[in-house]
Swiss-Prot record:
Its cofactor is Mg(2+). Binds 1 Mg(2+) ion per subunit. Expressed by the venom gland. It comes from the Eukaryota. This is Dermonecrotic toxin LlSicTox-alphaIII1i. The active site is at 38, 73 (nucleophile). It comes from Loxosceles laeta (South American recluse spider). Its EC number is 4.6.1.-.
Length: 311
């Protein structure tokens, strides 16, 4: 009898502990943060930046005509970086797939998203849509493996010009025609410019998304090179206010290039969702500090990058 009672009590203990764990996880109201390693264009750099604590990577995609050919930034670039590291785009995507496919020897559970900084400024107007189609084909074949156990990371397509909305329309059309419209659930969008003569207003950016047929999965970036002064973050604060409004169209906002502890804290304090940095370990250190470890945490795969955080 005593043995039976002990067994019952033991089972209840396990159940209660499990319930407490579930409640604890649900009660974690800290803002998830995407730690985006900046300008990762050579495959040898991928594990290096992941080892520094990045849960996301950004690569620059350059075109020959409308064909995405290399991951390459070129000069000038952020201070302290090698501007000319590169890889063939298809090879880079295949390598990303290895790092984000469960069961692969290179798989990293914490690598959850990558941003493709699409250098479409070199394209003529009639090349923009074909370029979007070609990027979709490359991702489908070399990253998603034609829908057969491809990489699981989320993808953000970052375009430097709100006038290039036809890129997105072409991209989406290819996935639909190929029978892989479901993969659009893994894709987000970021219209980041143009920067000259001045950045577009949020209203103009919103209109561009409407023209692209995009309603949701929207990221917005703001910032400058790492050797520029921080400034007053006026546009960033305006974007965050819009994101958090009742009729906001932005889901996530990230700031770049943030390399110092002071600028990292300043960006977190105003409410960003992501930090793009040349030194991912800096953010990791800040997230451990008192005053930050109770408000922010590193995003995981279970965090939806297309969902606006509500606290």
């Amino acid at each position: 009898m005593y043995a039976h009672l002990a067994l019952i009590l033991g089972c209840w203990t396990v159940v209660l502990q499990g319930a407490e764990t579930d409640v604890g996880e649900r009660a974690d109201n800290r803002r998830p943060i995407w730690n985006l390693a900046h300008m990762v264009n050579a495959v040898a750099q991928i594990p290096d930046f992941l080892d520094l604590g990045a849960n996301a990577l950004e690569a620059d995609v350059t075109f020959k005509g409308s064909v995405p050919t290399y991951t390459y930034h070129g000069t000038p670039c952020d201070f302290g970086r090698d501007c000319i590291r590169w890889e063939y785009f298809n090879v880079f995507l295949k390598t990303l797939r290895e790092y984000t496919t469960p069961g692969n020897a290179k798989y990293r559970d914490g690598f959850i998203l990558f941003v493709l900084d699409l250098k479409t400024g070199s394209l003529s107007n009639d090349q923009v849509r074909p370029a979007g189609e070609n990027v979709a084909k490359e991702l489908l074949q070399n990253y998603w493996n034609n829908g057969n156990n491809g990489g699981r990371a989320y993808v953000v397509l970052s375009l430097p010009d709100i006038g290039h909305y036809e890129f997105v329309r072409g991209f989406k059309e290819v996935l639909k025609k190929e029978g892989h419209e479901d993969l659009l659930e893994k894709v987000g969008y970021d219209f980041s410019g143009p920067y000259l003569p001045s950045l577009p207003t949020l209203d103009a950016t919103h209109e561009a998304y409407k023209k692209a047929g995009v309603d949701g999965h929207i990221w917005l970036s703001d910032g400058l090179t790492n050797f520029s002064p921080l400034g007053d973050m006026a546009r960033l604060k305006e974007a965050i206010k819009s994101r958090d409004s009742a009729n906001g169209f932005i889901n996530k906002i990230y700031y770049w290039s943030v390399d110092k502890v002071s600028t990292t804290k300043a960006a977190l304090d105003v409410g960003v969702d992501g930090i793009m940095t040349n030194y991912p370990n800096v953010l990791i250190g800040v997230l451990k500090e008192s005053g930050y470890n109770d408000k922010y945490r590193l995003a995981t795969y279970d965090d939806n990058p297309w969902e606006t955080f509500k606290n």
